[in-house]
Curated annotation (Swiss-Prot):
Protein's name according to its UniProt entry: Probable imidazolonepropionase
A GO term for molecular function: metal ion binding
Keywords: Histidine metabolism, Hydrolase, Iron, Metal-binding, Zinc
EC number: 3.5.2.7
Matches recorded under PANTHER family: IMIDAZOLONEPROPIONASE, IMIDAZOLONEPROPIONASE-RELATED
Binding site for 4-imidazolone-5-propanoate: Y161, H194, E265
Pathway assigned to this chain's UniProt record: Amino-acid degradation; L-histidine degradation into L-glutamate; N-formimidoyl-L-glutamate from L-histidine: step 3/3
Gene: amdhd1
Length: 429
């Protein structure tokens, strides 16, 4: 028995059709789309292993499968099918309400003003330290399920509110539990260098991460207790500056983790250049990236993960997406979901990318699919609808795919089904 057949779709957005593992430059202008019509729809078949087995017009596909049974069937008449969305940057494990900080920001407080006043990351760290694993897991579960309903089928999830070995491991264990119990797929990131713990210096914090936290993490990975793929550092003036960032990231890389870090968010401190030098897989934020940083990224394979929600809520200068795209940098997108930017929706993030970062809709969709997959090292299996890739899909009740971005906050209404590995994991009632 096959897992699924989708029939009669008006449009199927493949994104890629020739096995591309990244889209940048001119390739972003013409993403692959299979167009149907009122009289000739499109079918997608997912095999028993959760992978795409066939995509084609109904009249070509039906004869091949008329003797087949399917665990699920979707009538997508008048609808569009897109790849499952991929969120390239989130901080979803936390407790402690920070809604009061929103009023501070609206009154003119900067990110660092809030941080210095005892809010921000340190506020959340205090609450995470007091919480049990169960107390962290329940809100994480709710958030991830809401992301799934917004069309996200793969999400990057960071630790980073522990800032010591015990609590960073606690957060990573909670993420590991979510991987096993929830349908959404997760790429785990160790972010012990998210802030400098109170009473510590940057050097002391870096030494602790390198000599205690990373070895403990490696031991847990080797024991099969954790599956962590990436290492992150908040590379920022007054937090972990370039030299501390360098040694932490190198230690993580030496331990087998992919480099995927915060860079050049608030100040231009050459984070992009550092990432290119170290062979980073991805660098996030980049609001203050320099021209030299753009050049360095364009010459390397490092992906820029842009977070329009951050510029929006903090009223920051947005990252120079157009200059980066024009220079040949591959751009992915993320919600940056965290207590400072409470956004769970990749459709809204794509909308903001278009309006604030001046990206086109095809650029935004590539950033939320194939390029986001590449930022997590999964472009071989995720991020486009091609035979042999995982059948992760979003079915929307619209005849054109652009409605997923165009309708501001409209994803709750138009997302009809979310499919993960060929299984329907969400359907609108």
């Amino acid at each position: 028995m096959k897992n699924l057949i989708i029939r009669h779709a008006r449009q199927v957005v493949l994104v890629c059709k020739n096995g591309e593992r990244i889209l940048k430059g001119e390739a972003l202008k013409n993403i692959a789309i299979l167009e149907g019509s009122v009289n000739r729809g499109i079918s997608v078949v997912a095999d028993e292993f959760g992978k795409i087995e066939c995509i084609g017009y109904d009249d070509d596909v039906e004869p091949q499968y008329n003797q087949c049974s399917f665990a699920s069937e979707i009538d997508a008449t008048g609808m569009c099918v897109l790849p499952g969305l991929i969120d390239g940057h989130t901080h979803p494990v936390w407790v402690g309400d920070r809604v009061h900080e929103f009023a501070m920001k609206l009154a003119g407080a900067s990110y660092m003003d809030v941080h210095k006043a005892g809010g921000g990351i340190n506020f959340t760290v205090e609450h995470v330290h007091k919480a049990t694993e169960d107390e962290l897991y329940e809100p994480l579960k709710q958030r991830l399920n809401r992301m799934l309903q917004c069309g996200t089928t793969l999400v990057e999830a960071k630790s980073g509110y522990g800032l010591n070995t015990e609590n960073e491991m606690k957060m990573l264990k909670v993420i590991e539990r979510a991987k096993k119990e929830l349908p959404i797929e997760i790429s785990s990131t160790f972010c012990g260098a998210h802030a400098i713990p109170r009473g510590s210096t940057a050097k002391q914090a870096a030494d602790n991460i390198i000599n205690e936290q990373i070895p403990t993490l490696v031991k847990a990975i080797k024991a099969g207790e954790l599956d962590v793929e990436n290492i992150d550092v908040f590379c920022e003036k007054g937090v972990f500056e370039v030299e501390e960032t360098r040694v932490i990231l190198q230690a993580g890389k030496d331990a087998g983790l992919a480099i995927n870090f915060h860079g050049d968010e608030l100040h231009p401190i050459k984070g992009a250049e550092l990432g290119a030098e170290l062979g980073a897989r991805a660098i996030s934020h980049l609001e203050e990236i320099s021209e030299e940083g753009i050049k360095a990224m364009s010459k390397s394979s490092v992906i820029g993960v842009l977070l329009p929600t951050t510029a929006y809520i903090l009223r920051l200068k947005p990252p120079p997406a157009r200059a980066m795209i024009d220079a040949g940098v591959a751009i992915a997108l993320g919600t940056d979901f965290n207590p400072n930017a409470y956004c769970l929706s990749m459709p809204l993030t794509m909308h903001l990318a278009c309006c604030i970062l001046r990206m086109s809709m095809t650029e935004a969709l590539a950033g939320a699919t194939i390029n986001a997959a590449a930022s997590l090292g999964r472009a071989d299996t995720h991020g486009s609808l091609e035979v042999g890739k995982f059948a992760d899909m979003v079915v929307i009740n619209a005849e054109r795919w652009e409605h997923l971005i165009y309708q501001i906050g409209g994803h709750d209404d138009i997302i009809q089904h979310v499919v993960k590995h060929g299984k329907v994991v969400f359907s609108k009632r």
